[in-house]
């Protein structure tokens, strides 16, 4: 049998309501030289019947007899893949028709890039467009404090996946984030600066138990990156960076600790050159401005936080402070206009 250009790996567990739409979005791609590998992680609903209902020779169905988790299922699907490229897809999302054609064209034109993702448009519980950084050096920097890739948008080269697995033994939930970090330090990674997938937001996506596991594993990846940059890592620094990553780990941001950490990260990078200095500085400026502007209760507190750490001062932060200071004047002017 002729090997396809792209192998799409779709892992499913109890998604009977959404699976058909996800599969149809892949089988309807403008690039049709593909195979769709379904790895059913011991579903107990009608997902197996839905998967088998597609009369398309490009569909290959595999089933785990017991629930092994997403990382193990993903590794199984990749092991079965025969394509030159391997695309990831979730069982509740919708790939736009030209997604694979666009991504293959990008990787063909950029042979040094190991993988690429793209922007997503959410639907369901709420709607927004998630625009991620797209240049390789920016992605490498942003992985320090975020996950700037959406897993169901990823297209990888087979050569990238051949020597790696998704760390299923160490990471049950944050395996994708750990994988992107590993790859980014060896090969360039990228995003297409356009929407390639509709990402469904619904209540059944993640349980509280799974969320706790995800945060614990994310902390492990954050610690590893901090140790690589600073030469050491401690619980307080990891907790501060975790707050920046998820913005929900604590009710109030530990601004002094975060500011101190950002200053040490910037200084360490100037010595070690782990990241492009200008790009790291820009990312830290953005994060610091967002935290100070979002959590300082008053203009005076914003100025106090900004001025106490001159090493983190930026034009962006100065503009945010001025806007906050002018807010009462704007409110008074509008009130006078309506009087």
Whereabouts are the PLM-identified features?
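Cell-envelope/extracellular polymer assembly enzymes that use nucleotide-activated donors
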Residues: 4-7, 35, 178
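A conserved hydrophobic helix/loop-capping motif in glycosyltransferases and polysaccharide synthases
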Residues: 6-18, 22, 29-30, 39
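A conserved acidic beta->alpha catalytic loop
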Residues: 25, 32, 40-49, 66, ...
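Glycine-rich, basic loop-to-helix element that forms the pyrophosphate-binding segment
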Residues: 64-81, 102
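Conserved nucleotide-sugar donor-binding catalytic segment
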Residues: 79, 133-224, 228-245
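Short aromatic/hydrophobic "clamp" motif used to bind/position activated sugar donors
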Residues: 86
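Conserved donor NDP-sugar-binding/catalytic core segment of glycosyltransferases
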Residues: 98-130
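C-terminal subregions of glycosyltransferases and related glycan-biosynthesis enzymes
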Residues: 201-339
